[in-house]
Amino acid sequence: MIVNALSKAIMAETLCDELKLNKPVAKEMVENFFEELRHALENGQHVKLSGFGNFTLRDKPQRPGRNPKTGEEIPVEARRVVTFKPGLKLKTKIEKIGK
């Protein structure tokens, strides 16, 4: 179980409180934000959020793998993955929290 996780519902509620929006509008804003991120990544674009970080696409080549139960060698197919690299501001704030 994840404790203290930020959900889309919590984000929408924060928008309601901070910007005095009604709940359906806030939920739609949050959904639209994530839909834009998904759309950009699906179209091969990188997503750069200033002060937060970058989402980039990386192509991973096929590689040999192993079935942990049988030890049988099986190929792991080539695939595209999304990676996230935190921006300097976010990194700095997270490092300060850890101290």
Curated annotation (Swiss-Prot):
Summary of the function given for this chain in its UniProt record: This protein is one of the two subunits of integration host factor, a specific DNA-binding protein that functions in genetic recombination as well as in transcriptional and translational control.
CDD domains: IHF_A (cd13835)
PROSITE patterns the UniProt entry points to: HISTONE_LIKE (PS00045)
Region Disordered, annotated ranges: 52-73
One Pfam entry name: Bac_DNA_binding
Keyword flag Transcription regulation: yes
Taxonomic path: Bacteria, Pseudomonadati, Pseudomonadota, Gammaproteobacteria, Legionellales
Gene Ontology molecular function terms on file: DNA binding; structural constituent of chromatin
Annotated organism of origin: Legionella pneumophila subsp. pneumophila (strain Philadelphia 1 / ATCC 33152 / DSM 7513)
Keywords: DNA recombination, DNA-binding, Transcription, Transcription regulation, Translation regulation
Highest taxon of the lineage: Bacteria
Protein family according to the UniProt entry: Belongs to the bacterial histone-like protein family.
Signal sequence coordinates: none
One GO term (biological process): DNA recombination
Subunit text: Heterodimer of an alpha and a beta chain.
Gene Ontology CC terms, in alphabetical order: cytosol
Name of the protein: Integration host factor subunit alpha
